[in-house]
């Protein structure tokens, strides 16, 4: 109860200013003005990349038909234009692209697909680790072990991103949630692209068909989750995995990737509990092998992909924590990227150093990551010329940094900081 009362006191003392409120405008004109004033740079090529994936997916998807796809495209365009919905859909655009591309995989003609690798993963497993770890862990089964594997793999795995999004919104610095959304989306998008270019059979295929060559006519299998269906008298996992758009997507393991990325973000916000978060990663890795869905080498690939995406986001965009602050409403300014230490950042804020560009800003200190110096050009220009948590200025401001920190934020800033993302 003491922790809860302390949290309530902190929340009551917070300056919950207008910059943390939802944008409620339905007028699309501010979005068009933002686009018109955007300082375009090579970093905006990411949207060309996303558009290319969406166009490819729309070409190959057979259901829904043309008008269905046209209607969805129009709704998405409206959602990205109207400020009320833009603050949600803009940070999620990468996740939406990944989901549509993942769904489109079931419609890709077989003549466009590369051959399926059946022997590569078990061979690598034996070469690197001296044995097939997945086979060893799945030999002994028991209903209790099935439940222990099902809870994180079949339940927590799918709910964790939403729970973590809520936690990051409340307890992380403003701007962390959109960084999490984009990092999560890009990790999954790259993972699916690798699975499309390098299709590999999972352990359940070896158990069912041996090392015989595979074809795309083979349907997916729930593996060990079939025992969960039998235990509860359902067919949820059997039906779900049998109709999966990506049957031969063993490498990299996005189950391991999700768990690792979740652990990295939570460890960033709650470093004291990082061992618990990484313990969950190990637990889920055991589940994937016990349920015959992945080889250990798949898990390594998925975790490496998550680490690469997180490090990139951390260096360039992830807001820094500040000592003594727990809730997002306690932050008066935010520094993006980790080119500077927390001590140096706090010192810059106290002294009003010109290297600190306002309430929420990048630092142009020479010791920062070199690439960070041009990140202001990546962001959409704020036509009101106001600073807010999650925004950048379209032109250098003459006032000192200390004055900028004390200025009230723009009332048009979203709680998701969506309109100012690169």
Swiss-Prot record:
Residues 109-159, 205-245 are lumenal. Keywords: Glycoprotein, Golgi apparatus, Lipid metabolism, Membrane, Phosphoprotein, Sphingolipid metabolism, Transferase, Transmembrane, Transmembrane helix. It is an enzyme of class 2 (transferase). It is a multi-pass membrane protein. GO terms for biological process: mannosyl diphosphorylinositol ceramide metabolic process; sphingolipid biosynthetic process. SMART domains: acidPPc (SM00014). The modification Phosphoserine is found at residue 353. Pfam families: PAP2_3 (PF14378). Component of the inositol phosphorylceramide synthase complex composed of at least aur1 and kei1. Belongs to the AUR1 family. Catalytic component of the inositol phosphorylceramide synthase which catalyzes the addition of a phosphorylinositol group onto ceramide to form inositol phosphorylceramide, an essential step in sphingolipid biosynthesis. This is Inositol phosphorylceramide synthase catalytic subunit aur1. It comes from Schizosaccharomyces pombe (strain 972 / ATCC 24843) (Fission yeast).
């Amino acid at each position: 109860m003491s922790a809860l009362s302390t949290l309530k006191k902190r929340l009551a003392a917070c300056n919950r200013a207008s910059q943390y409120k939802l944008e409620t405008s339905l007028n699309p004109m501010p979005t068009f003005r933002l686009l018109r004033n955007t300082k375009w740079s090579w970093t905006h090529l990411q949207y060309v990349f996303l558009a290319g994936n969406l166009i490819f997916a729309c070409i190959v998807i057979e259901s829904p038909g043309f008008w269905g796809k046209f209607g969805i495209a129009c709704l998405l365009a409206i959602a990205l234009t109207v400020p009320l919905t833009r603050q949600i859909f803009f940070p999620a655009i990468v996740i939406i692209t990944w989901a549509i591309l993942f769904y489109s995989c079931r419609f890709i003609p077989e003549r466009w697909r590369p051959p399926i690798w059946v022997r590569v993963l078990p061979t690598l497993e034996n070469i690197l680790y001296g044995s097939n770890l997945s086979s060893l862990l799945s030999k002994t089964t028991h209903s209790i072990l099935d439940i222990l594997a099902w809870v994180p793999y079949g339940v927590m795995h799918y709910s964790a991103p939403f729970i973590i999004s809520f936690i990051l919104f409340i307890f992380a610095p403003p701007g962390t949630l959109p960084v999490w959304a984009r990092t999560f989306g890009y990790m999954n998008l790259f993972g699916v692209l690798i699975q499309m270019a390098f299709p590999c059979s999972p352990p359940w295929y070896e158990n069912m068909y041996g090392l015989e060559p595979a074809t795309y006519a083979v349907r997916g299998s729930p593996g060990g989750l079939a025992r969960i269906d039998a235990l509860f008298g359902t067919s949820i996992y059997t039906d779900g995995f049998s109709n999966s758009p990506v049957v031969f997507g063993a490498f990299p393991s996005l189950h391991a990737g999700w768990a690792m990325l979740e652990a990295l973000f939570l460890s960033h916000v709650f470093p004291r509990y990082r061992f618990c978060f990484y313990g969950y990663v190990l637990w889920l890795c055991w589940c994937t092998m016990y349920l015959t869905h992945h080889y250990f080498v798949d898990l390594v690939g998925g975790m490496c992909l998550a680490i690469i995406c997180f490090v990139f986001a951390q260096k360039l965009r992830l807001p820094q924590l500040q000592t003594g602050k727990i809730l997002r409403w306690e932050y008066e300014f935010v520094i993006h990227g980790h080119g500077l230490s927390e001590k140096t950042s706090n010192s810059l804020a106290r002294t009003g150093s010109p290297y600190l560009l306002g309430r929420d800003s990048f630092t142009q200190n020479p010791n920062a990551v070199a690439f960070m110096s041009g990140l202001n050009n990546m962001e959409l220009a704020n036509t009101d010329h106001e600073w807010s948590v999650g925004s950048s200025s379209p032109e250098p401001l003459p006032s000192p940094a200390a004055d900028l920190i004390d200025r009230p934020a723009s009332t048009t800033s979203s709680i998701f900081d969506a309109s100012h993302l690169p």
